[in-house]
UniProtKB/Swiss-Prot annotation:
Protein name in the entry: Cytochrome b
UniProt-listed InterPro entries: Cyt_b/b6_C, Cyt_b/b6_C_sf, Cyt_b/b6_N, Cytb/b6-like_sf, Cytochrome_b, Cytochrome_b_C_euk/bac, Cytochrome_b_N_euk/bac, Di-haem_cyt_TM
Keywords in alphabetical order: Electron transport, Heme, Iron, Membrane, Metal-binding, Mitochondrion, Mitochondrion inner membrane, Respiratory chain, Transmembrane, Transmembrane helix, Transport, Ubiquinone
Binding residues for a ubiquinone: 201
Gene Ontology MF terms in the entry: metal ion binding; ubiquinol-cytochrome-c reductase activity
CC cofactor note: Binds 2 heme b groups non-covalently.
Assembly with partners or alone: The cytochrome bc1 complex contains 11 subunits: 3 respiratory subunits (MT-CYB, CYC1 and UQCRFS1), 2 core proteins (UQCRC1 and UQCRC2) and 6 low-molecular weight proteins (UQCRH/QCR6, UQCRB/QCR7, UQCRQ/QCR8, UQCR10/QCR9, UQCR11/QCR10 and a cleavage product of UQCRFS1). This cytochrome bc1 complex then forms a dimer.
One GO CC term, this protein: mitochondrial inner membrane
Statement: the UniProt record of this protein carries the keyword DNA-binding: no
BP terms from Gene Ontology: mitochondrial electron transport, ubiquinol to cytochrome c
Family listed: Belongs to the cytochrome b family.
Membrane topology qualifier: Multi-pass membrane protein
Residues passing through the membrane, by range: 33-53, 77-98, 113-133, 178-198, 226-246, 288-308, 320-340, 347-367
Source organism of the structure: Aepyceros melampus (Impala)
Amino acid sequence: MTNIWKSHPLMKIINNAFIDLPAPSNISSWWNFGSLLGICLILQILTGLFLAMHYTSDTTTAFSSVTHICRDVNYGWIIRYMHANGASMFFICLFMHVGRGLYYGSYLFLETWNIGIILLFATMATAFMGYVLPWGQMSFWGATVITNLLSAIPYIGTNLVEWIWGGFSVDKATLTRFFAFHFIFPFIIAALAMVHLLFLHETGSNNPTGILSDSDKIPFHPYYTIKDILGILLMILVLMLLVLFMPDLLGDPDNYIPANPLNTPPHIKPEWYFLFAYAILRSIPNKLGGVLALVLSILILALMPMLHMSKQRSMMFRPISQCLFWILVADLLTLTWIGGQPVEHPYIIIGQLASIMYFILILVMMPVASTIENNLLKW
């Protein structure tokens, strides 16, 4: 009798992707984040579905419906906080996943990398729209500030913003459409993630050395299934510590004040995972320039394959590049800190220096370091 896993059309796909998949024997825990992101996405879709059953997307009742979920719905509070903090876990895993790709040269899988960038943009858009839904002060003003950035686009900007708003300000129409988009986007993300995986399985996984590992492959199951389960358990542990002990640690207290168009909060800032980009945006005193820098801060990832000057794929054996990589990480942490600070001295200048440093590191210093390393190795 033939094995159903290998003969059935659907089972065959699952088998080739998660069971009999040939995987490098030496991939480290940095390769766990793909599966963690998958779990995050499933968790977000499930908790989001249950929240959507009780949420109302009308400006008069949105805030109250979230309160109702937390107070009156059975286990509504845990579903709400798992969804809110699940987004933070999602972005932690995303940043680690992208960082791994940069460090080990995974960006040389062009299709996989480019779909990953689209996934990153889609996830950021989804998180932004989700933050608007509770209709607190930061929801309303965050939506106003970020959507208003599109007015910097020459000629069509103002019309574009009013079209997105569905009026002359962020109002009922905006909230309703954001809810609709926030609901549909995760399914688009799931579909894109499957394409991401499809392209990855065309080439096989990279590994820490960056050397071709075709001669030394092991089956995905049981080796990496058990490794992924360990990663998932650790992630759920961290998530539940957040949810059960400090659910509001990463949130903004201003979002517990219902949205009021007549009262601006003293410091408008997005969720922590957007602060690095927000700091870059604020560093440029010109609206259009800021918006361009904001988009380029993520889109610069698409240039990584072209900026790869090294004869080696991974940074594992490239100490100069390693130093620059960790300086880049420190720079991004600095930008994240600055994004949450008020616009005043000395934060302005620190933010500007960190923003310049970010682009110089990626566009100039890393390619130069790669070339130096090639020469040191007489290549």
